[in-house]
């Protein structure tokens, strides 16, 4: 059981503050997205920091858990937080996220859904994106405005 799941048992649906890592996998100018099972919207692979873990470790772990992929290196792109990273899950859980956005480099492995958090994994061009979860939309807008070099 994750640390956040344990906290949820104590605080119920009240807002929690969570640090986590989100991982950009970009291949041939396309971004890897996951169709989330909890919201049925597309997001960027990632998740919450566990006790004793550094954010880079979170990025490596979440990439493997959610996509089946490995990366040789994670490069920190930016840290994002604030009102745009407040999220209410369909079950009513409220969360303020502090997101460390990483770029996965030298990615290997075979795409596969391994954890039940994703319904589908797919690469999309930045100019033809599906229905995005709000935090993913904010991160992609940030990339388009501040790090066009990542898009290709």
Label every PLM stretch briefly:
Residues 26-66:
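Conserved Nudix-box catalytic region and its N-terminal flanking loop in Nudix hydrolases
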Residues 80-110:
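Active-site-adjacent beta-strand/loop module that shapes the phosphate/pyrophosphate-binding cleft
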Residues 25, 101-105, 123:
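Short, well-ordered beta-strand micro-motif
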Residues 1-22:
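Acidic, metal-coordinating catalytic segment for phosphate/diphosphate chemistry
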Residues 13-17, 91-98, 115:
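A generic structural micro-feature
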């Amino acid at each position: 059981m994750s640390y956040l799941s344990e906290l949820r048992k104590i605080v119920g649906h009240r807002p929690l503050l969570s640090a986590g890592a989100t991982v950009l996998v970009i291949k041939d100018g396309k971004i890897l997205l996951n169709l989330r099972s909890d919201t049925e919207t597309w997001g960027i692979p990632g998740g919450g920091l566990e006790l004793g873990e550094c954010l880079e470790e979170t990025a490596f772990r979440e990439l493997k858990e959610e996509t089946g992929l490995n990366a040789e290196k994670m490069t920190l792109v930016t840290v994002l937080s604030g009102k745009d990273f407040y999220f209410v899950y369909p079950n009513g859980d409220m969360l303020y996220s502090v997101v460390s956005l990483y770029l996965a480099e030298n990615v290997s492995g075979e795409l596969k859904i391994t954890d039940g958090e994703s319904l589908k994994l797919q690469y999309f061009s930045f100019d033809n994106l599906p229905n995005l979860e709000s935090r993913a939309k904010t991160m992609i807008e940030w990339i388009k405005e501040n790090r066009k070099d990542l898009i290709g």
